Amino acid sequence: MNISANPAAVHKPLGKYCHTTLVPASARWLVVSGQVGIDKNGKLATKFRKQAEQCFRNILACLRENRMRKGDLVKTTVYLTDSRFVDDYRLARSRVIGDVTLFTSTLVVVDGLASPDILIEIEAWAAKA
């Protein structure tokens, strides 16, 4: 079982994440490449929140394919093309991921992604003991 924590000597997280996740040595790891807001039919959502929700749906599909669940998430790295998307990102994450054990997360605002129509990309790491 992964153990998430926020050390007392570190500031309170600025969002819904934790500062550390301890993964047992016996864990099976899954690394999910950056997911964008494209559905299984190859259609890119046009609105930011829909893209963000699709990113998380894609990640959950990758977890299921490997006999993992959202509680096995250890880390995400999120790339946004505009800092004004942060609140909508958080809403999309809560809507799709819901209340799970918190995992570590890094959010970065970048000038652009692989296509100007892609507004968000999320890479994920998961571990299952």
Regions found by a protein language model. Name each.
Residues M1-R57, A61-K75, L80-A129:
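N-terminal presequence-like segments and the immediate start of the first folded domain
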